[in-house]
Each structure stands twice: as structure tokens, then as C-alpha cells.
Amino acid sequence: MGQCSSATKMRRKRKREEECCRESMERRNKGCLAMVKERRSRFYIARRCILMLLCWHKYANS
């Protein structure tokens, strides 16, 4: 009877550890995704600004 109890406790402990690891990975993935979105938006803004400056320079002399 003691062995069954011990095995059950070990399974519960393993399950908790797996859940903890999964939650940690999900948090990390969300953080990475947020960082990628921010970088992408900053790059988009920079591209638009450069394009605007190039067009302004080209047509300002006309």
C-alpha cells in the first residue's frame, strides 16, 4: 500500500513540474512574440520615415 501511495505522489509531483515548465515556456513565448511585434512595427515606421524623406528630397527641388 505504501508503494502505491508513493507512486501516486511521484506522478502528481511530475505533473506539477510539467505544468510549471509549460507555463514558463508559454510566458517566454508571449514575451518573444511581443518583442517581435514591437520590432516589426518599429521597422515599419522607420521604413515609412525614410521613404517620406527620400520623396520629400526628390520633389522639394522641383
UniProtKB/Swiss-Prot annotation:
Task: Give the UniProt subcellular location, in the record's own words.
Answer: Cell membrane
In its keyword annotation, does this UniProt entry include 4Fe-4S?
A: no
Region Required for DVL/RTFL small polypeptide activity: list its residue ranges: 27-58
InterPro entries recorded: DVL (IPR012552), DVL_RTFL_regulatory (IPR051525)
Parts of the chain that traverse the membrane: 39-56
What is the top-level taxon of the source organism?
A: Eukaryota
- Membrane topology type, per the record? Single-pass membrane protein
Say where the protein is mainly found: membrane
Q: From the UniProt record, give one GO term of the biological process aspect.
A: shoot system development
Give the UniProt entry's GO cellular component terms.
plasma membrane
The record's keywords, sorted A to Z, are: Cell membrane, Developmental protein, Membrane, Transmembrane, Transmembrane helix
Q: Is this entry keyworded Cell membrane?
A: yes
| Alphabetized Pfam families for the sequence | DVL (PF08137)
Query: What does the record give as the function of this protein?
Result: Small polypeptide acting as a regulatory molecule which coordinates cellular responses required for differentiation, growth and development, probably by restricting polar cell proliferation in lateral organs and coordinating socket cell recruitment and differentiation at trichome sites.
Q: Which family does it belong to?
A: Belongs to the DVL/RTFL small polypeptides family.
Name of protein: Small polypeptide DEVIL 17
Q: Which organism is it from?
A: Arabidopsis thaliana
